[in-house]
Structures are given as C-alpha cells and as structure tokens.
C-alpha cells in the first residue's frame, strides 16, 4: 500500500522455468519465515517507540521500511531508517525496502532502476516490497525473476534478495513462481467480504485457486486495516483461514493506517493470537478451498515454456480494484 497512504485497487499451472524459480522462492520464504503464522510490519513511521515494539516482538518476522523517494527517483540512505533496519536485522527480522511500481504510471525500466537504487542505498536490506503492481500483468513482473526482455532480472543483479509483490488483490495464476511473497489482500476490514465474493465467483476460481493451496501458504501475505479493536482476534483468524501465513492487522484507518503500531493493549491481543498459531497451540484451520469446476483442467490457464508469466488472454470476470489516494509523509 502506498501509504504513505492509499486504498489500493484493489496460476494454477506454471511453466518449468516458473516452477524452478518458485521452488527456490518457496525455500527462501520458508527459511526466512519459520513460524506457521507471523506478522509483517509496514513500518511507515518514524517514532522510536513503534520501531522498538515491532523489533522486539518475537512473532514479527518481516519489517518493511519506507524511505522517501527523491524527485530524481534515486534513493538516498536515511540515517534514521538505516539504523532502524540494522536494529531489526540484529533481532533476526527480515528487512524489506518499499518500492512502488505505480501501476501503469511508471515505466517498468524505471521501476527496475528504483529497485537497484534501493539496494544501493540500503545494501543490507533482505529484499524489496514492490507495491502498486497490477494483478494481471505477469509479463512485466516475470522480468524480476527470469530476466526476460530488455530488463535483466533482479535475481541476477541482486542474488539472495527477496521479492514481495503487492497488488493488494487476488493475483492470476501466472504469477506463481515469480516472487517470494504475494500480498493478495490489503483493504479495510469491512471490505474483505467483497474480496471473498470475487475469488469465489465460478468464472474466477480457476485463476485464483493457486493462492489457496497448502504448499503456497508460507508465501501468502494479507494486511487488513480499520478493524474494530474488539475484533482483532477474529481478523487474525480470518486471514489464517484465507491461507495467509504472514499478516498485519490494525484498527488504524485511512488515510494512513500504517503510520503507527496499534496501542499496546490491542497490539498485545494481536501478538497473543498470532503466537497461538505460531506455537501450534491453535492448529491451522483447513483452508476453505475454492469451488473448482469439474473441467478445471481445461479452463485453467496453462502456460508453456514460451509463454511463462505472460498475461492471460482470458481474465476473471469481476476483479475488484481499489482507488488510490496519496498523502505526504515526512521522514
């Protein structure tokens, strides 16, 4: 989410290449996230207290730092953010740098350059969190992993770095294998039902079923804001039931739901519930599988080695998109 802020608009079969990349990606994700369920904190704030609480929470496994992007598109290391990220790494957290892809408003070569610049400014970061991507343009994002086209893959230029893609919406099956993490739901709590309705439309299930498979769980992220304070346990449970392994739940609201951590009393409730899943005290629920049509083998998009990651010719019938609002944040 570009929050500083916004509400974002909001592949069952992969190719041999994508499967190979996906296998490596899954290994990285599982190695980094040893807990069955954990928290990723979008640390789009400056105050030391919020950073300290996030860093010292055992079930927080990922922290996303949000640097300012200068007008020339080049990241310049901020002393304060560099120090916070170093403290997080010292506590065993996986640190990611926020980079926006700007939907179709930013050229893909510029996005690739921003990623390079982010790693130049923050070389010790473990990866990038790429926001504002399109749910249906796999051909663009394939270049991140496979290095096809005119842009060399990020994997080749930055080996060992993680990639998390964030459309904040359901992603087509052709994305499978292109990243280490997929944030497939990011919205207000009251709007989650619309997401559920979308992925369960009969015409959509072949495209979205991959996100609900048990073996993909370590790579599925979800973030839900505007949650009533008394319902944070329920919001955690619901995210886990949707196959999310990495999550963030907050009662904070737009225009910037990530400008602070929840108050201690609420944060502790969230931590306690996640901890119950992480330790196995509460077993992971059986994910409610999508209703796959009997002819799924023929209706599911299949990619060949020549078309891996290419946007599908037939798209889901009612993909939900979210509007974007932006605010300015000082660092």
Please identify what each model-predicted range represents.
Residues 32-294:
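Glycan-processing catalytic domains of CAZymes
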Residues 97, 304-308:
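Fibrous stalk/shaft segments of extracellular and virion attachment machinery
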């Amino acid at each position: 989410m570009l929050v500083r802020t916004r509400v974002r608009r909001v592949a069952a079969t992969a190719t041999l290449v994508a499967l190979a990349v996906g296998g490596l990606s899954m290994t990285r994700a599982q190695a980094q996230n040893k807990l069955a369920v954990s928290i990723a904190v979008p640390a789009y704030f400056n105050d030391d207290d919020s950073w300290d609480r996030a860093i010292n929470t055992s079930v927080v496994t990922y922290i996303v730092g949000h640097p300012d992007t200068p007008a020339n598109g080049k990241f310049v290391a901020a002393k304060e953010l560099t120090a916070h990220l170093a403290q997080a790494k010292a506590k065993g957290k996986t640190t990611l740098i926020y980079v926006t892809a700007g939907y179709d408003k930013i050229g893909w070569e510029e996005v690739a350059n921003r990623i390079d610049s982010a790693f130049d400014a923050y070389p010790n970061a473990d990866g990038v969190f790429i926001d504002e991507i399109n749910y249906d343009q796999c051909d663009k994002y394939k270049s991140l992993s496979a290095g096809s086209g005119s842009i060399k893959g990020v994997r080749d230029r930055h080996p060992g770095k993680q990639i998390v893609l964030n459309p904040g919406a359901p992603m087509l099956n052709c994305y499978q294998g292109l990243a280490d993490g997929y944030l497939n739901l990011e919205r207000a709590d009251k709007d989650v039902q619309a997401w559920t309705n979308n992925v369960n439309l009969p015409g959509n299930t072949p495209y979205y079923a991959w996100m609900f498979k048990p073996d993909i769980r370590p790579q599925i992220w979800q973030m839900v804001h505007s949650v009533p304070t008394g319902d944070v346990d329920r919001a955690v449970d619901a995210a886990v039931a949707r196959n999310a392994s990495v999550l963030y739940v907050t009662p904070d609201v737009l225009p910037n739901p990530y400008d602070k951590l929840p108050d201690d009393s609420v944060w502790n409730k969230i931590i306690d519930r996640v901890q119950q899943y992480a330790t196995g005290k509460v077993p992971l629920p059986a994910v409610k599988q999508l209703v796959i049509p009997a002819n799924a083998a023929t209706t599911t998009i299949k990619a060949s080695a020549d078309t891996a990651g290419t946007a599908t010719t037939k798209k889901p019938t009612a993909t939900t998109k979210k509007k974007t609002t932006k605010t300015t944040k000082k660092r």
